[in-house]
């Protein structure tokens, strides 16, 4: 899992499963990878059950939890996370030295430096559906693989993801939009922004 092997990032997400073998796999990747690692969905569930593995790594680590996953990571309730989203994200990112994307309305992006915090204003409730978080994690992985610094990659991915959701909602309605339609709108936005 070394950058010199041509691997530019690793993403562990939905479908990974949570069992003895995948716990071992995630632990080994965190210990050995020199490229950025993105944990989402099952990757986060594994980390929540074995939280110390987050400190035993050498590569940049980015986590993209929703409030329920964040509650599992912190050992509290989702209501407690929602009551202080910026504080929870900031504390966790600083304690574990990670870049954290706390998904939800006004997604919070926190870096390991206490001063590194962004609150995103793009996005809408129509994005709260299966596959939307996978699109975000894929965007984040793409930007990280291109060498963008983790906090900047997270902020850019979250902003563009939300903007694509806003454009999709405008064209198809919040009820009619899908992550696939968001991805199509993202392609148009990237072309418009020159990316």
Model-derived features with residue positions:
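Charged C-terminal helix
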Residues: 163-195
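Short beta-alpha connecting loops at secondary-structure transitions
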Residues: 73-74, 120-127, 137, 141, ...
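Single conserved hydrophobic/aromatic residue that forms the stacking wall/gate
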Residues: 1-15
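Short, charged, surface-exposed loops that flank catalytic or proteolytic processing sites
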Residues: 78-85, 147-155, 173-177
């Amino acid at each position: 899992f070394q950058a010199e092997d041509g691997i530019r990032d690793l993403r562990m997400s939905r479908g990974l499963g949570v069992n003895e073998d995948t716990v071992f796999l995630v632990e080994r990747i965190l210990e050995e990878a020199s490229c950025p690692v993105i944990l989402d969905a099952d990757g986060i569930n594994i980390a929540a059950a074995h939280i110390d593995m987050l400190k035993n790594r050498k590569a940049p680590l980015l986590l993209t939890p929703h409030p329920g996953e964040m509650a599992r990571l912190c050992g509290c309730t989702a209501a407690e996370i929602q009551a202080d989203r910026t504080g929870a994200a900031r504390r966790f990112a600083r304690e574990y030295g990670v870049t954290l994307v706390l998904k939800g309305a006004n997604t919070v992006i926190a870096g390991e430096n206490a001063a590194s915090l962004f609150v995103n204003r793009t996005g809408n409730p129509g994005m709260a559906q299966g596959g939307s978080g996978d699109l975000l994690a894929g965007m984040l992985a793409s930007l990280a693989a291109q060498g963008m610094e983790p906090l900047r990659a997270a902020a850019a991915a979250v902003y563009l993801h939300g903007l694509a959701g806003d454009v999709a909602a405008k064209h198809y309605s919040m009820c009619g939009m899908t992550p696939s339609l968001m991805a199509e709108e993202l392609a148009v936005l990237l072309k418009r922004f020159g990316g």
